[in-house]
Amino acid sequence: MIRTSFKHSIETRNQLLHRRHFVVAAALTVGNFVFGRDARLADAMDNGELHNKNEDYKAKAEELKEQRLRSIANSRPMKPCYEGHVPLYPHERVLLFITSGLKSYFHPEDGENIVQLGEASAFTPFLERLKNTMLSDKTGRRILREQPDITSESLDMDRLKKMAPNTLGHSYYKWLIKEGVSPDTRAPVKYIDDPTHAYIFKRYRQCHDFYHAVNDLPIIIEGEIAVKALEAANIGVPMAALGALLAPLRLKPVQKKRLYDVYLPWAVRTGLSCEPLINVYWEELLEHDVEELRKKLRITPPPDLRAIRRERAQQRKQFKLKYERHE
């Protein structure tokens, strides 16, 4: 009797355990189905794969992106007037002028600072005067009408390489190779509102290397200051005038002496006496004899800055050797 009762108790316990395992397994299965489904739903929602199966999620995302861009555009003082245009409020322009000016002074090696300062200081009266200078000249009017771009492709660098050594094109090509630069490195204009003014400033910026090449001035700091002074005297670029006045303050005494004695007087004299360089259609003069072109533009190149620096370095080297022998 006792044995039968004990046996019955064990069977009952096993049934309960089996039933509990079944319930737990069922609960886990249901939980995995429910919560796992929730996790899958969350992933699907995040991937845009849910809700209306006929809805194009990519199109929706693109629409949201466009809405954000429109909201940013609506926060500007005007709609962009040309590709890449970033309209600024007056206080933003003042802030850009101050910050880019300070950064240009302390970090002149960063071209982005110079680019921003150039546009922040490109005041409307200056650009309007430059436009009138171009409109008063036959070639200047044609440049404004045609609005050419100076790029490696438009100039055809292989063609320049094969030109006669005495041509402007070959001289320009040699200068580019020597200095390790390209016509394509000029930044686009962003912060000037009027499209015509923006093109004029872009044209000035793209012609900058021709001013270097026709005068054989390197892109080292002294050469850049000399070209900036030339641009300030000839074209009246505010940023160029600021650079010519302030940049020499950070130079070594020997560099300052060269600039103040030779290159700045040359730049101011040449800039005031030569033809308006903004009206020169450089692309059409590539096959011209560079010496004849200089005479036509009334430009006399300055002394060779590279040669002067090499001579100075050689003198220092000889002086150092002489000093070491006497020690």
UniProtKB/Swiss-Prot annotation:
Zn(2+) binds at H208, D209, H212, E224. Keywords: Lyase, Membrane, Metal-binding, Mitochondrion, Mitochondrion inner membrane, Ubiquinone biosynthesis, Zinc. GO terms for biological process: ubiquinone biosynthetic process. GO terms for cellular component: extrinsic component of mitochondrial inner membrane. The keyword Transmembrane helix does not apply. Its main location: mitochondrion. Pfam families: Coq4 (PF05019). Its cofactor is Zn(2+). Pathway: Cofactor biosynthesis; ubiquinone biosynthesis. Its EC number is 4.1.1.130. It is found in: Mitochondrion inner membrane. It catalyses: a 4-hydroxy-3-methoxy-5-(all-trans-polyprenyl)benzoate + H(+) = a 2-methoxy-6-(all-trans-polyprenyl)phenol + CO2. It is a peripheral membrane protein. InterPro entries: Coq4 (IPR007715), Coq4_euk (IPR027540). Coiled coil: none annotated. Component of a multi-subunit COQ enzyme complex, composed of at least COQ3, COQ4, COQ5, COQ6, COQ7 and COQ9. Lyase that catalyzes the C1-decarboxylation of 4-hydroxy-3-methoxy-5-(all-trans-polyprenyl)benzoic acid into 2-methoxy-6-(all-trans-polyprenyl)phenol during ubiquinone biosynthesis. Belongs to the COQ4 family. This protein may be expected to contain an N-terminal transit peptide but none has been predicted. This is Ubiquinone biosynthesis protein COQ4, mitochondrial. It comes from Lachancea thermotolerans (strain ATCC 56472 / CBS 6340 / NRRL Y-8284) (Yeast). The lineage of its organism: Eukaryota, Fungi, Dikarya, Ascomycota, Saccharomycotina.
